[in-house]
Regions:
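Interhelical loop and helix-boundary elements at the membrane-water interface
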Residues: 1-15, 64-73, 112-132, 181-197, ...
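Helix-coil boundary and interhelical linker segments in multi-pass alpha-helical membrane proteins
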Residues: 23-40, 86-101, 136-158, 207-221, ...
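N-terminal topogenic module of multi-pass integral membrane proteins
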Residues: 1-91, 255
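Hydrophobic, aromatic-enriched interface-forming segments
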Residues: 127-180
Length: 268
């Protein structure tokens, strides 16, 4: 009898993109709600369904006929979605209906990403679309904790999407640098490969400054983005073909934790 191994995402960094915003959303209310635990469990279930569902969508779009893979993907997609739904239902029965449209945004971003990846595999745009959907966990958790979908909920979503977009763009920079196979890169190569990275971080920080200027978000939000922005600039200047991705992963997790700590104490 064939042993069925769980299908789980290989992009472990995506877990941080989901659960760091969730911690922020739960913490800024300064009051703990037990419903957050159910939301976290439900979110994990739907998050794990991503890989098998992506396989099914690709099979549908590409006309795949690998029956074994399709059958296994259906099984695990059903298990994960079923688990997510089990934890979701009590929240809906308790009146937390606002998480439904937020979840729909997450599902829509998944479908859009899965569709576009056929033509834009490995492109920054595809991963940025995923970030928009994954960071919906921030407003969803805030809504469950506070019972409100207000300016703070929208701000948390915007800030988290912008920040984790920074990490995505930066990782793509490192991937392009590694693909060059050059031990040392000249300034022309660094500028060519790093333009998008620098431009995105500049625009993201500028937008955060604008939000602070119009009193839409606390001033500390600027400080929260500063470390990642400086790291992105340094990473472009020091870019080479030698990249230690495991070390990079730990650094970005540290950046995410620092971002979360600063935003939690921003005083929303």
């Amino acid at each position: 009898m064939r042993r069925l191994n769980p299908i789980i995402p290989k992009e472990h960094g995506a877990l941080a993109v989901v659960f760091v915003p969730m911690v922020i959303g739960a913490s800024v209310t300064q009051s703990f709600s037990p419903w957050v635990i159910l939301l976290a469990a439900s979110t994990l279930g739907f998050f794990l369904s991503y890989v098998p569902m992506q396989t099914l969508v690709r099979g549908l779009l590409d006309g795949s006929r690998d029956a074994a893979i399709i059958r296994e993907s259906k099984l695990w997609a059903g298990i994960y979605i079923g688990a997510g739904t089990i934890f979701l239902v009590p929240m809906l029965l308790n009146g937390h209906w606002m998480i439904v449209p937020l979840g729909a945004v997450g599902a829509a971003s998944f479908m859009l990403r899965a569709s576009l990846e056929r033509w834009f595999h490995g492109r920054v745009l595809v991963d940025l679309i995923a970030v928009v959907g994954l960071t919906v966990s921030a407003p969803a958790t805030y809504v469950v904790s506070s019972g409100l979908f207000d300016q703070t909920a929208a701000t948390l979503w915007i800030l988290n999407a912008l920040f984790f977009g920074c990490t995505v763009v930066y990782v793509h920079l490192k991937i392009r640098g590694s693909a060059s196979k050059k031990r040392r890169l000249g300034w022309s190569d660094k500028i060519r490969l790093g333009t998008l990275n620098l431009l995105y971080h500049l625009l993201a920080l500028s937008f955060v400054i604008f939000l602070v200027a119009v009193h839409y978000t606390p001033r500390i939000a600027i400080i929260a983005f500063a470390p990642m922005t400086m790291h992105a600039i340094y990473g472009t200047v020091s870019l080479s073909g030698q990249v230690r991705f495991k070390r990079l992963g730990f650094i970005l997790v540290g950046q995410s934790v620092l971002f979360a700590v600063l935003l939690i104490h921003a005083g929303f």
